[in-house]
Each structure stands twice: as C-alpha cells, then as structure tokens.
C-alpha cells in the first residue's frame, strides 16, 4: 500500500517538474496545490480504504502557517469543540507530499477529557503540500479539515544538534502541566518533549557525505493516572525532539506519565507528579 502511494507521488512530482519548466516558476505554488490534491485521491484509498470523508470545517479547526519559517519544524494545532470531541475516537495527521505521508495516527482513551480538545505538535514538510487532520467518530464516520502549507526540504534538513550531543540526551523528557478550572469541570493541558533526533534517512552527514540512518519515535502512550489520554503511532514526519501539547481529563492529583519507543526498539519513559506541576 505504501509503495503504491510512493509511486503515485513520484509520478505527480515528474508532472510538477514538467509544468514548472513549461509555465515558469511563478505558477509553481498554484500547481503544487492542485497536484497535492490529486495525490490525496490515492492516499485516501490507501489509508482509509476509500471510505467517505466528510467536511469538518465546522467541527475541526487547524492552525498552521501559510508559509513556514522552517520546513523541519512546522507548528500545527488541531482544535475540536467539546460537542464534537466527545465522540471522536481517533485523529490522523497526513501531509500529502511527504515521503511518509501519515505523520501520526492517534487513538484517544478514557482520559482524553470531555471539554474542548486540542493537540499541538511540530512536523517536517518535504514539499509544498496540503496538511490534513482526519477525525474518526465512534460511529465510524470520518471528518477532515486541511490547509495548504508552503514549506520544502524539511525531511532532508540537517539535524539541529551534533550527533554525539544528541546521543547523550537521547530519550530524556520534559513534561509540563497547565490546569485551570471552569465551573465544576476541570480543564487541563499538558505538554511533553522527548529528546530524540528523529532522523529520516534522508539527511546527509556533512562530514562523511553518507546518509544518516532513519531512527525515529514511532510509539507514544500518555496517561493521566491509570487512564490513557492518547496513544500514537508516528514516523519520520514528526520533527526532531518530538513535542506535543494537548488537553486532557483525569484528576488534578493524577500523575502524567509518558512512555515512548523508537524504531530501533529503545524505550523511554517520564512522569510528572502534581507537586512538580
């Protein structure tokens, strides 16, 4: 399935190159937007089996830059109102033109909360592309919102940190919690960052001229007390030092716990007790 998606995007890339040559670079952004929409047709089938995807413009909002300052660190924030979020069981983030289009597949748990829902992270972008958020509700329906973002080169951009320095801090976590009360309901936000190079396999070592092997965080589970807030499966499209900020439920006295694994099989864990908030 992934091979099928890659071949479709390769064909689209050749068409884009030809069009830019004939029509001029001034038309490239508009053509890129059209091309990425065409790529989505194949991804839609590969990822969701061609199931109907409904317009979520009144139920999901996405905050992302029109033009990113750094294609290796593109901030995106997804928000859903409580009335809709209560029925959402999963969220999939997709960048059409990335070598690995599925950025993250997120499953919500019992501690996801009953209020407005928010998830913020940072992603890599290889080319100008639509960025999509697709929510699945408990009745199996899919709802999508998308935004076209101008950014390129993020998947092959050199790491921000020296490899030896990154190795020393590999897996270390920083976790923060933000709590506020609204009436009788507790609304909370938390944030964590995992020190990890999240290499893509497309980055060249400037000294050796060789490509750095891919190594990335591919599994994350976040809990409030004994209950899961969300679990995630990810890939190379998540930025270096994966960073997530999110809303959640649970009790103010709960410990926030984060467990993660990477593609080399290494495991990492961290937690934040209420006294540390």
PLM-predicted stretches and their roles:
Residues 17-21, 137:
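Short stretches within intrinsically disordered, low-complexity N-terminal or propeptide regions
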Residues 163-165:
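N-terminal helix-cap/turn-to-beta initiation motif at the start of protein domains
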Residues 167-169, 204:
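Non-catalytic macromolecular-recognition regions in eukaryotic signaling proteins
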Residues 8-10, 26, 227:
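Intrinsically disordered, low-complexity serine/threonine-rich segments
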Residues 169-175:
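Terminal interaction module
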Residues 20-29:
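C-terminal segment of classical bacterial N-terminal signal peptides
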